[in-house]
């Protein structure tokens, strides 16, 4: 397999600009013929014109005359082109129904959709397919009117008509220049839900959501989420929508969550369709977040885009930050923040410590699809949040305004964003640039001592070596701190001339001591408040210190983190006891703290549910070597069993309290969702303590399962039960919702994530289910993806879990390398496993690597893991 690596250092501005792009799609069966007419302007006359493409090439013309060209692989080179502005006409033929990669133009059912980010446009036609080539697009679509009554593309519809042969045509014009990755086309038989939004300047924007006719009743929440996002972006950022129409199309076959194509967003149905019968509270929250995210891209991604794909976090990190803020402003800011932190630590921290570690702005890649990562998105969002922490809301907004003033309509870099933040606030952020160029999660080691009424906090920072870089420079790290006395009260202190109960300490050196003055009593420091930087922070807290922070700290993150640390210590003690073959510890202090949390009626319910959540196995073994996953699983399960049995009466009582507070008729709202979240926590502990309770659940299932959140909670709680009753409940669930694709995704996820002893057998059976298709990414992620995260089965001692996933990677890679590359990253833990499992994984990876025709998507990941 040939290996082509692209490097950030090799960036050159494009030799040619494409001022105007006129596209003509003639959709027939089975082929679609695409004609493009490009108005090209040389930037460096004399260089050849190089176009990217993989479609069947029919013809190439320059200024109307047939052109001489060389086609090698996916590169079309025209050596002899005019030195002044000229036109290029390219005609290609594509077969959408045969395109199983879901990139470019592809069929989903009887309809056609596109996905062009990052390099899908080249599957449609030949083009300078890079984000810094921005062009004004006009698109004409011709198709059979009966089969494809709806024809959509970017921008505003400016013309249309019918032919005598039963075909019709529509012409779309996008007045804003955009790169090719933002092009979109949809053709099919779709129903539309319409609404309107009046912008802050009084413009009346038409909103259209396209779905199947059957799904039309499920789009209401997504429509309202869009209107809320449009209003929020005006209020918080002063950003107004710029076209006459905003369209969203939902498709069931989609590699990603959604795509922000200018004026024509294409969404995975998972993030559009919802009602109480089929969607959980988490689904509703996900829809609001993703709808917001894609809308916010209109400014942070579309109006200002990336110069090159190495700068992907410029748009994605910033827009994730914006959608997190949107969700936080909508409901439960503290809980949303902790959920984001947990996502980061469960998924991005291991990525930063593994074989695929890369900076927020990568320096090289073989396959760009592999860099749509947690690092680029979630760590990128934390980098943006640090700007906000350092500058405050006012300073951050000043930076945003300058960013748009300088760069609206341009393709720019992460450094341009940093410069806008620095210049708008008169601050030097040169050192901050290391967050973009250094991979790895910084580790802070902190110590504190009280001396002469000064609490001296000493912090040392190290950035661990990663495959791309051994030696790292000290980072600029904001550490937000507070102090509590032994009664749990906030203690004021003086720092840099200000007296307060909280301050942001700015680390810029490998080791610094920060004097917090005017402290006259013993204190416990509350460190990294709000998770002010994406780092590990270690401080020699005693258990009593952590119990005090858990009971009294006003900062939600440090309170939750105290609980997480106590749980981690308890699991570590269980792990040691299991290894030594002795009895498990009693954990009396932890249990007393948990009892207080359960009994605290003043706690927010969603926050209480978070405090009662034990870290996952992946969080528990993070930062360790020679990992035996089953030992961690056993130690964690033992702690959960202890909590379940010890507080069984309290779980029953708390469940009854929550049931009383819920509305009888389900309607999603953050307040009622919090109660349902707590109920599901209680149910899980009850069914863990009393597995036989499953029979009562089965008898009263229809009464208990009033909405999908309840059904999800109940089935999750019984999913590991070895009885036939569990199988019957799951089968009933599948029968009940057999015609709902998204709920069937939930069913397949239950099968793949079960801890039952026969799970692998049940997964293999589910592969033959009439509603399962490996070619559908949602289905593959639900069944195969969930199994790859199933600790006891994926990491089975005999290697059967590894073999199963490897076989599926090979199978999926033949038609959808992007999904296969995501799945193969389940093996990223390879080199940290104990020797037996490490060898098993390496055997499977070598088998994958030996496959003829292996994609560069999968090959790049496998190569990095094997080293």
Can you annotate each of these PLM segments?
Residues 47, 57-63, 428-431, 439-527, ...:
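Beta-strand-rich binding/interaction modules
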Residues 373-374, 517-867:
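Long, ordered, helix-rich scaffold segments
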Residues 91-194, 219-221, 432, 556-558:
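Extended, low-hydrophobicity, Ser/Thr/Pro/Gly-biased non-transmembrane segments
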Residues 1-33, 58, 102, 106-115, ...:
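N-terminal, polar/Ser/Thr-rich
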Residues 43-45, 52-108, 129, 164-165, ...:
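A surface-exposed beta-strand-loop module
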